[in-house]
Amino acid sequence: MKDSALIELFLNEIWIEKQLSQNTIASYRLDLTALIQWLEKQQLTLINLDAIDLQTFLGERLNQGYKATSTARLLSAMRKLFQYLYREKYRTDDPSAVLSSPKLPSRLPKYLTEQQVTDLLNSPDVDIPLELRDKAMMELLYATGLRVTELVSLTIENININQGIVRVVGKGNKERIVPIGEEATYWIRQFMLYGRPFLLHGQSSDVVFPSKRALQMTRQTFWHRIKHYALLSDIDINSLSPHVLRHAFATHLVNHGADLRVVQMLLGHSDLSTTQIYTHVAKERLKHLHERYHPRG
């Protein structure tokens, strides 16, 4: 069987078994395609390579300038692939078992100050239907901490404006209920009344925030919109990421004393350690303020 066919069998297996998102599956496919392209040049296959071949491949990637984070993601995909090939008896061993992960730098998530968030949220011209949509989306994102993928795929049946809640189906098909808040609720109502009908052009759509072609927005389109408003707000776009408002949501909650387990629940994190990064952000902020304003800082 060809290597490409084995990869597709593997991806189908983990998509069903692990309920991974399409974005994760696409990342795995991209990484593993790079592996089999390298193997072809070495006249090797997924079945006859050994651990030294994998180490050589990873070493070449690092020498080519790929970041440790990219290499760690690739290694994760490779481990899952070879575990699958071993389990399904395509191989008699797992050559990835002896590989060590590259050491990753501890990075704090990028976030905005409360004033920067206010400036960003006030940037759209709400008299324009498209920008009214963007305003409602950003308000909802900051109010709930949704992932961008969760936001753009949000459907009408999963939002209850009267109760002020959204039902989110997140990673691993895990469901959570998140309150919206008054400000976001107001702007969603405004969009539903005055913006959404204009964007739909008489068509029907299940998604709350359709594109100007009445389709579901892509993550890339929303990220482009965020950067547009950041530039209008004099915010350095190099300090941003697509999840900047999600990070701001969590960081500002922690700064104001929110219980970490509540933040974990709202974000949909399965592990509290993932949420604890925001306590480090808060500590870094306090340290910065102390150094800036204390006479002996």
From Swiss-Prot:
Gene Ontology CC annotations of this record: cytoplasm
Disulphide bridges, residue numbers: none
GO molecular function annotations of the record: DNA binding; tyrosine-based site-specific recombinase activity
GO process terms (BP): cell division; chromosome segregation; DNA transposition
Residue intervals of the Tyr recombinase domain: 107-291
Domain Core-binding (CB): 1-86
Keywords: Cell cycle, Cell division, Chromosome partition, Cytoplasm, DNA integration, DNA recombination, DNA-binding
Cell compartments where the protein resides: Cytoplasm
Active site: 147, 171, 243, 246, 269, 278
NCBIfam families: PRK00283.1, recomb_XerD
Role noted for this protein: Site-specific tyrosine recombinase, which acts by catalyzing the cutting and rejoining of the recombining DNA molecules. The XerC-XerD complex is essential to convert dimers of the bacterial chromosome into monomers to permit their segregation at cell division. It also contributes to the segregational stability of plasmids.
Family: Belongs to the 'phage' integrase family. XerD subfamily.
Known partners and oligomeric status: Forms a cyclic heterotetrameric complex composed of two molecules of XerC and two molecules of XerD.
UniProt-recorded name of the protein: Tyrosine recombinase XerD
Organism: Pasteurella multocida (strain Pm70)
Gene: xerD
